[in-house]
């Protein structure tokens, strides 16, 4: 396989709202990131993946973009971004952005035009359909955030499609004008000097609407639609166009969020020649825990890792991760965040880090941050939880049962503020944090672990050095000779 800079890198995901607050308004920001660049450099980071910082009304914490070429006011200005980019490069690190192009915000100018009338030139930039004869939704597909994928718009008497929240209408990728606008925007960022994109929800841009209504599982109002809205036939043509008109023109790092891709069809996604991205985030290993059994299935985990490593060997590259902004903390779900907290944090780190691929660390993972101790359903900020809460409440259901359902697996668990010190609010802010800091910040924080040579943080530093050593880095081949009941 070819040697590339991104194969030798260690990446770190920053969720800006929760990383570091420089002006004490309770919200992390871009200047706050600059303040912590030396920390990331000292940790051994080569690439920073910055979650969305674009202008957004924040229905889904920035994944609902209203302007791709402007900065969310809470995070700073474009001047602040330029300074962040410059300071990152000055330290020999690279910066990649989160690219969300399956959908926009309903406050994006494109959608405002699209919904204004059926005759608007941008009407076909989004997905519109007439109601059924009884006035109901065009089909019975379920949103990833619960409820219907369709929202009725009274102005034009049609429904628009939203795979995520109703404030995140899906772009119509079958329209070539949409694709051209997206590629033009991507190239604008590349010309500014960014080093790549992590492309959000990219397997969802192609839908098979011809499938119509789907079987509705017992106890549900709508039908899960992953089989018809994820990695559908024809998607590779659009991704090839993205590669031809944008990605292939720059020395960049590209990562596709590729839910629904399996090792058998991964070659067209990440193959050295025909692949559309350098690497992908696949979720098969994370899905093992969400089956409903909170126990960690070592054998199944091992088998999944084996399959991805073996089937991509010599063909494509793996993106290695166990946490991100959408996942709960692994020390709490796959391990024991009390008695065996240290062992849980470090053992899982070794297993995923030393496979062949580029490892990603999610902020706070390197100090063993844990799930938040939720005590009421009203505490949640996650739009998926809030949507189901409203549905259950409107139907007269037991909203208290949602707490047991979501307290371990909600997305807020990974979005609590970074724990820098044992001072008020964990050193994240001197103001009121946008979301409560985990109460265990007094014992789990960067400052304390920096002084302890045997801490989780210093374990990660040693692990990163090992990953980068001449004996083990890029050319590491994966083998697993352990007995079936052992992970390695």
Please give the residue ranges for each predicted region.
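Acidic/aromatic-lined carbohydrate-recognition and catalytic surfaces
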Residues: 2-187, 191, 204-262, 418
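Short, polar loop/linker segments at the starts of domains and inter-domain junctions
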Residues: 20-34, 295-298, 335-341, 428-434
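Hydrophobic residues within beta-strands of alpha/beta enzymes
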Residues: 48, 197-199
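Conserved alpha/beta catalytic core and glycan-binding cleft of carbohydrate-active enzymes
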Residues: 106-140, 239, 243-417, 422
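Glycine-rich phosphate/pyrophosphate-binding loop
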Residues: 149-161, 165-173, 411, 416-466
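Active-site rim elements
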Residues: 169-179, 226-229, 330-343, 404-405, ...
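Conserved small/polar residues in nucleotide/adenosyl-binding loops
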Residues: 478-485
């Amino acid at each position: 396989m070819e040697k590339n800079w991104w194969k030798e890198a260690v990446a770190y995901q920053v969720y800006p709202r929760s990383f570091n607050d420089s002006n004490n308004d309770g919200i992390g920001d871009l200047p706050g990131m600059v303040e912590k660049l030396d920390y990331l450099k000292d940790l051994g980071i080569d690439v920073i993946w910055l979650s969305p910082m674009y202008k957004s009304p924040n229905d889904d914490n920035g994944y609902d973009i209203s302007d791709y070429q402007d900065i969310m006011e809470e995070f700073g200005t474009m001047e602040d971004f330029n300074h962040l980019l410059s300071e990152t490069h000055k330290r020999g690190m690279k910066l990649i952005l989160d690219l969300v192009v399956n959908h926009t915000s309903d406050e994006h100018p494109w959608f405002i035009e699209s919904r204004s009338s059926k005759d608007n030139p941008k009407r076909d930039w989004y997905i519109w359909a007439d109601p059924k004869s009884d006035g109901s939704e065009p089909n019975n597909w379920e949103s990833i955030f619960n409820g219907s994928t369709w929202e009725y718009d009274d102005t034009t008497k049609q429904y628009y499609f939203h795979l995520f929240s109703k404030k995140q209408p899906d772009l119509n990728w079958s329209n070539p004008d949409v694709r051209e606008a997206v590629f033009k925007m991507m190239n604008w960022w590349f010309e500014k000097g960014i080093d790549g994109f992590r492309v959000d929800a990219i397997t969802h841009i192609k839908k098979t609407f011809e499938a119509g209504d789907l079987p509705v599982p017992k106890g549900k109002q709508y039908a899960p639609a992953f089989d018809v809205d994820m990695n559908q036939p024809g998607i590779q043509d659009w991704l090839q166009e993205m590669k031809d008109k944008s990605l292939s023109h720059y020395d960049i790092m590209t990562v596709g969020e590729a839910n629904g891709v399996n090792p058998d069809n991964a070659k067209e996604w990440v193959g050295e020649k025909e692949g559309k991205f350098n690497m992908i985030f696949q979720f098969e290993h994370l899905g093992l825990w969400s089956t409903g059994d909170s126990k960690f299935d070592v054998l199944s985990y091992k088998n999944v890792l084996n399959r991805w490593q073996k089937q991509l060997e010599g063909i494509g590259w793996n993106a290695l991760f166990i946490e991100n902004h959408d996942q709960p903390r692994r020390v709490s779900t796959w391990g024991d965040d009390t008695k065996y907290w240290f062992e849980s944090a470090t053992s899982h780190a070794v297993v995923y880090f030393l496979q062949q691929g580029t490892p990603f660390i999610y902020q706070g993972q390197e100090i063993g941050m844990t799930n938040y101790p939720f005590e009421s359903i009203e505490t949640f900020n996650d739009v998926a939880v809030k949507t189901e809460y409203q549905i259950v409440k409107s139907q007269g259901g037991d909203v208290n049962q949602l707490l047991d359902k979501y307290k371990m697996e909600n997305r807020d668990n990974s979005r609590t503020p970074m724990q820098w010190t044992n001072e008020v609010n964990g050193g994240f802010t001197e103001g009121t944090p946008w979301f409560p800091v985990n109460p265990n910040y007094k014992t789990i924080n960067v400052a304390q672990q920096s002084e302890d040579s045997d801490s989780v943080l210093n374990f990660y530093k040693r692990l990163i050095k090992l990953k980068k050593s001449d004996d083990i880095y890029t050319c590491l081949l994966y083998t697993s000779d352990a007995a079936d009941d052992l992970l390695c």
